[in-house]
Amino acid sequence: MRYYVETDGRVFLVERGDRLDLPRPEEIPFPVEPIAPLVGDDVWFCVPSLDKHPRSWHHKDDLPTSDRALPEVRSAIHATMPRVVVEGLCLREGRILLVKGSRGLTEGRWTLPGGFLRFGESPEACILREIREEVGLSGSIDRFAGVRSKLGRRSRLHWTMLFYRVAVHGEPTPAPDEIAEARFVPIDQAPEMLHDEDMSCVLRGLTDRPAG
C-alpha cells in the first residue's frame, strides 16, 4: 500500500536512490486521511494534516516531466486530474432529448447529449459543439442549470459535470459513429432511463419553463 499525499498543488514524495516515489504509510511523518483509491487498490489519495504550507514538497505540475519521478508517481498524478464534462438539457413541450451511445463509456446506454470540455474551450461552446456533433442540431444557451461532482465507481476518476439548458430546433439526426439513437422522451420518464444517477437527480428537479 502506498499513499498519494497532496495539498495546495504540492505532493509529498520519498527518495529511493535518485528517484522520487510514493510513500508507504509508515514513511509519512504526519497524520493523513485516506480518501479514495487511485490506481488499483494499492495507491490511495490522502489529505494531510499540517500546521503550515509544505514549501519543500514537489510541485504537482513539475512531476509529469521530471526524470526523477517514477512512473507510479506520474500515473497517480494523472488519476487525480478532474475530468470535466458538459451536459445539455434540451427541453421541448415537456420532453427532453436523450441519446444512446454507440461506443465508449455510453455504448448502449441512454445519456444526455454532451462530452468532454476541450483545452481552452468555454463550457457554453463545448455543449453547443457536442450537440451539433452528436445529433446535428444548432442550439442556443438558455441558462446554466447546475453542477455535480463525483468519483466514478468503475473509473475511479474525479468527474465534474456542468449542466446547461439549451434551446434546439428541428429533429435530431444521430451521428452513427458516436450515437446509436436520439429521441425526445417525457421528462418524468427520463430519469429512470439514464444510466448515470447524477444526471437522473438533475432531471428529477427539472421543470420545463423558460428562464426569467
Feature names for model-found ranges:
Residues 45-89:
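Acidic, metal-coordinating catalytic segment for phosphate/diphosphate chemistry
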Residues 90, 163-167, 183-186:
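Short, well-ordered beta-strand micro-motif
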Residues 4-40, 95-133:
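Conserved Nudix-box catalytic region and its N-terminal flanking loop in Nudix hydrolases
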Residues 138-147:
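A short coil-to-beta-strand element that immediately follows conserved catalytic motifs
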Residues 1-12, 74-96, 113-116, 165:
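Conserved N-terminal beta-strand and adjoining loop/helix that marks the start
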Residues 157-171:
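Phosphate/ribose-recognition catalytic cores of enzymes acting on nucleotide-derived substrates
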Residues 190-191:
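A generic structural signal for short hydrophobic patches within well-formed alpha-helices
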Residues 77-79, 148-161:
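Acidic pyrophosphate-coordinating catalytic loop
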